[in-house]
Regions:
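Residue-level detector of alpha-helix initiation sites
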Residues: 10-11, 34, 110-112, 150-152, ...
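A Rossmann-like FAD-binding core segment of flavoenzymes
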Residues: 67-94, 98-101, 162-259, 298-302
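Conserved FAD-binding catalytic core of PHBH/FMO-like flavoproteins
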Residues: 135-162
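Beta1-alpha1 glycine-rich phosphate/pyrophosphate-binding loop at the start
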Residues: 2-70, 154-179
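FAD-binding core/adjacent interface of flavoenzyme oxidoreductases
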Residues: 1-7, 23, 28, 74-142, ...
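Short amphipathic alpha-helical segments
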Residues: 17-18, 41, 116-119, 157-159, ...
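FAD-site-proximal beta/loop scaffold in flavoenzymes
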Residues: 116, 122-138, 234-281, 288-291, ...
């Protein structure tokens, strides 16, 4: 029996483990894909206070090392199921066996929806991005495209239009899911072009960097769009299915918490991109992890 199990080894989970371990709690972090989370895919991180410019991989490695040095047990094993024991503790079934914990911090994150095109994954960090706020500054003065038709796509396009030479928003339908006010704002930007009834069929790279997109309209006609950046804004999918029986979720599947990261289930906390919130950034994930750990430690002390 451990005191605290953390599911997910990204910035939120590693921060939670760091704080809980420093508070003297026995902590185990379970991660099935790779410690550090999605930030490790970023070639350069410039918006984490105090570090200047650092690669995402180096930042993830530093977080891992710091949590481990504090005394957290970091286990490369995927949690497959969580259930509540009759005594109120939690049973976690992992790839390597079962373990019980008095409290759980769920920080499994959320994955971006992709285009699903060949070569897309290889171009992440080399022209393809799923976060305009994170990576937009790397494309100042360049020609970029945004794929999507919802609020996020238009917000990204407007943000990028303020710093890029040109922005092309590409949507597969004639109508948008975005609020009309955002659509009207985008239509007024001189360096922002909106293409409808259009899909991206191919990503062409030159020397490993995105060079142009191949587009196809409803009539099957293909066109070539030269861009150095593509921001895919199809939304994200939270990895919360295994927590559905324990905690409440919103319509998109994100876990609902209060400002102390507590879910409706006593002793079950959530942190990072998997929970319902307005902004999903590296710094907000770290903040969530801190709050979740402090709340979990207080909860453990009260039991």
């Amino acid at each position: 029996m451990i005191e605290l199990a953390v599911i997910g080894g990204g910035p939120a989970g590693l921060t939670a483990a760091l704080y809980a371990a420093r508070a003297g709690r026995s902590v185990a972090v379970f991660e099935g894909s790779g410690f550090g989370g999605q930030i490790t895919l970023s070639p350069l991180v410039e918006n984490y206070p105090g570090l200047g410019a650092v690669s995402g991989m180096e930042l993830g490695d530093r977080m891992y090392a710091q949590a481990e040095a504090a005394g957290a047990e970091l286990t490369f094993s995927r949690v497959q199921r969580i259930e509540r024991n009759t005594d109120g503790t939690f049973l976690l079934e992992t790839e390597d066996g079962a373990i019980s914990a008095r409290a759980v911090i769920f920080a499994a994150g959320a994955k971006p929806r992709t285009l699903g095109l060949p070569g897309e994954e290889a171009l992440v960090g080399r022209g393809v991005s799923y976060c305009a706020l994170c990576d937009g500054p790397f494309f100042d003065g360049q020609d970029v495209a945004v794929a999507g038709g919802g609020n996020t796509a238009f917000e990204d396009a407007l943000f990028l239009a303020g710093r890029c030479r040109s922005v092309t928003l590409i949507h597969r339908r004639k109508t948008f899911r975005a609020e009309q006010a955002l659509v009207e704002q985008a239509a007024q930007r001189k360096n922002l072009t909106i293409l409808t009834d259009m899909v991206i069929t191919d990503l062409h790279a030159d020397n490993g960097e995105l060079e142009h997109l191949l587009l196809k309209n409803a009539d099957g006609r293909e066109t070539r769009l030269p861009v150095s950046g593509l921001f895919v804004a199809f939304g994200r999918v939270p990895d919360t299915e295994m927590a559905a029986a324990l905690a409440e979720r919103d319509q998109e599947g994100y876990l609902l918490t209060n400002d102390r990261m507590e879910t409706a289930a006593p002793g079950f906390f959530a942190a990072g991109d998997c929970r319902h919130k307005q902004v999903r950034q590296l710094t907000t994930a770290v903040s969530d992890g801190t709050l979740a750990a402090v709340s979990a430690c207080r909860w453990l002390a009260e039991q």
